[in-house]
Amino acid sequence: MSLIEFERRVNALTQMRVADVAVPILDKDDRHHLFKVLRAQAGEEIVVTDGRGSWAFASVGDGEIVRTSDVVQDPEPYPTELFIVPLKGDKSELAVSKLVELGVTSITPLISENMQVKFKGEHREKILERWHRIALEAAGQCRRTYDITINGPVKVSDVPVDVAVAEPGTTGSLRGIRAIAIGPEGGWAPGEWSEKQLRIGLGSTVLRGETAAIVAATLLVLRGEGWAVTSYEGAVRNNGFIQ
């Protein structure tokens, strides 16, 4: 993507979801948001995407939108996953929003002994519904074209052994790691994890759960994609410097 195209994408009024990027049609809710909330005017430009990597520019018309560019297919992102224990208040929602912005591809809610949030039945469904809504909003704001996957909840005992566990005071290499588990307020319960599970530290300070999730996501995405030093016009791309 050229710098000019990138700036055009960023400066578009908004990004909206459509079923078919080639022939973009907004649903009732998105049409209301575009014309009544954002008060889009004829001729203004937006980005449309299907959440599967395809996107295009579109122009606002009289109660509709019209595609004005070729359909672009973005490359699939480097697979990264965060296992996060639901946190009190809106902390989990903040984490979900930032993980979407950072480019994490998958989030799995984690059931831990020390979790302090009701996460069963109707409570669980409401929480996951909010996560999905926030993820969609964040994707539009950051111009992300691939939806993040929000999986069903799993217990600590069911987490694959190749998932690294974030634990203060430990050290471990991120080499080959694509998934990290972040604990609840108060930390993991003694003996909650198998001795076989890799432990990694996230710095010398004790982080809040939502901060730990953001730090872990940054490390994973940095290692996988090297977006810390990225060019649009042929400059050197530095990748994989975190060992």
Regions found by a protein language model. Give the residues of each.
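Structured adenosyl-cofactor binding patch, chiefly the S-adenosyl-L-methionine
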Residues: 190-243
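Conserved beta-strand scaffold positions in the cores of enzyme catalytic domains, especially
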Residues: 150, 163-165, 197-201
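N-terminal positively charged helical leader segments and presequences
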Residues: 1-73, 235, 241-242
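A C-terminal functional module that forms or caps the active site or interfaces directly
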Residues: 175-190
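Short, acidic/turn-prone active-site loops that include or flank metal/cofactor-
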Residues: 70-72, 170-171, 185-187, 204-208
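RNA substrate-binding interface of SAM-dependent RNA methyltransferases
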Residues: 3, 73-162
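Structural motif
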Residues: 83, 165-167, 179-182
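Glycine/charged-rich beta-loop-alpha catalytic/anionic-binding loops adjacent to active sites
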Residues: 24-26, 77-81, 194-202
